[in-house]
């Protein structure tokens, strides 16, 4: 589950991570943002974070926005890292108007970090997360985020396991669970301010 292992011995159940990040980035671009940071965990070749970075880059490219590697902030995928990355971004003063985060917990930490720096979400900076954790809709403002059906991944894994028990020689399958964007209040229109 959630692996990009290319071994033909294993089934694969995952989401299209690149497309999810593309959706998030395209959403903020659609709201008029051009200076968009990317908050993520450690980028590993063929990993989930790398796929999400590719989706971010693709959305920028399609919109004619040059990719700037200095706007990619790597940390850990946790709350404290989100706080730290927000502080770092504020201290570097890069005129960023939006952040695409690779996980809700990272985005939620970033919201706290921005708050501590006197930066208002979404008035001063917009943010989009990834996962659609239950808490994301209870925040103020509610976190716009990429929704992935985690329970559906589990159901598909059990289904594949049972099928494989009945037929040990079955062809290995790759199942891709669709993602969608949960629009809430953490992104604002720029109205030609950039």
Region annotations inferred by a language model:
Residues 34-35, 67-71, 121-126:
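Short acidic capping loops at alpha-helix termini that bridge into adjacent secondary structure
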Residues 1-23, 65, 105, 131-143:
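Flexible loop/hinge segments that line or gate small-molecule binding clefts
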Residues 2, 14, 40, 74, ...:
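Short beta-strand/turn micro-motifs composed of small residues
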Residues 24-63, 173-187:
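An alpha-beta-alpha
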Residues 11-13, 70-73, 144, 175:
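Structural signal for short hydrophobic segments within the conserved structured cores
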Residues 21, 74-92:
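Structural motif
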Residues 31, 85-193:
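Flexible loop/turn connectors
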Residues 57-81:
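Short beta-strand elements in bilobed, periplasmic/extracellular small-molecule ligand-binding domains
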